Amino acid sequence: RGVEIRGVVDKDIDNKSYYRDTPKLEKIFKAKIRDDFKYDLETKKILSKKKYSENNKCQRPEDTEGPLQCFEGKGYASKNPFPFKGDIMHNKFFIIDNQYVWTGSANISDTGIGGYNANNVVVLDSKFFAKYYLEEFEQLYSGKFHRRKAVARHKDISKKIDSANISLVFSPKGYAMEKIFPIIKDAKQSIDIPIFFLTHNAVSKELVKAHNRGVVVRVIIDSTGASNGYSKHQYLRDNGIKVKVENWGGKMHMKTAIIDQKHIIIGSMNWTKAGVTKNDENTLIIKNSSSKGLQLTNFFNDMWLSIPDKWLDEDTKAESHDSINSCTDGIDNDFDKLIDNKDIKCL
C-alpha cells in the first residue's frame, strides 16, 4: 500500500545470517536491505595483523583453548578458540512514520516473539526518540557499522515523558556502561537482573559492591550464558549474590535491570565487552517510572519463583533433562548442532 520499507541485517564473514529466512527477506525487498558483511571482512584483515600475547598472571582453566582472561585472581577461558566471525549488528528496533519506535531484546523469530524465549520490548510514541533512532539507522544503512560509527561518548539523548526520564545510548560508540554504572552505584534497595550473557568485569564488581552495602541483588541468567567460559555468575554467587540459572527450554534472552523497582535498563545489549565495544546495540535507561518498574519487578518475581532453588547453586545444561522441554522442542538449545535425542545429554 505504498509504505517504504528499509532494513539492516547482520551477516558474518561468510556472508551468512544467523536466521535461515533472512535471504527470503532480502529477495523480497532487494536493494532495500543492507548488511555488515563487507565491513566484517575489512575488520578481519585488520585483526589478522595484530599479535596477541597471553596474560600469565592467572592460571588457565583446564581443557580450555580460548583467550585467557584474568579477573580477581582467577582465570577464565572458553573451551574452544573462537576465530573472528564478524562483529554483530545486534539491534532489534523499528522506526515507524518517524513517530513510533519498537525496541528491546526480542529477535523477530518464532522463538523470539512467539513466547518461547523470555524477552521484553518498549514502544515509544515520540518524534524525539524516533529522530535519534533514525540517525542511527542511517549510519548503519550507509555502511557505518560497529567501530566505524561516529563517537557519541558525551552525547546526551534524554527526554522526560510523563513522569519518567528516558535516556538513549547506542553502542559501541556511546560508551553505554558509563551511563549504566551511576544507576547501579546509586541503588538503595534492590537490583533485579534478567540477562542472557553477563561477562563484563566492571559491572560484576559494581554488583558485588551494591550487595556489600546492603542492596538486595538477584540475577537470572540463561543456561547457555552460564556455560560461557567468561561468565561472571559464579563470581557473583561466591560473593553472596543470589543467581539462578534458568531451567526452561527457551532462552532467558532479556538484557534488563530493574533498580529500586522504579529505574529500568532495557535494550539489545548483553552485559559483555563485545556488547559494549564492538556490536551495534541500543539501550534505554528509564528513571522514575514506578508503574513500569513495579510491572517488571512482578514479572521478574514470577520468573524467579518458576526456577527451583536447586539452580541457585548449580548450573543447568541448556539441552538436557535439566531444562524443561529442551529435549523435545526441535531446537538446538546449546548450539552444538545436536537436537533433542541426538544430543547425548537428552538420552
PLM segments and residue spans:
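Histidine-anchored nucleotide/phosphate-binding helix
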Residues: R1-E4, N201-H211
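HKD-type phospholipase D/PLD-like phosphodiesterase module
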Residues: V3-K185, R213-H263, G267-S291, L312
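Acidic/histidine-rich, surface-exposed loop or edge segments in extracytoplasmic proteins
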Residues: K188
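Long, repeat-rich segments with strong aromatic
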Residues: F196-L198
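Amphipathic alpha-helical interface segments
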Residues: G293-T316
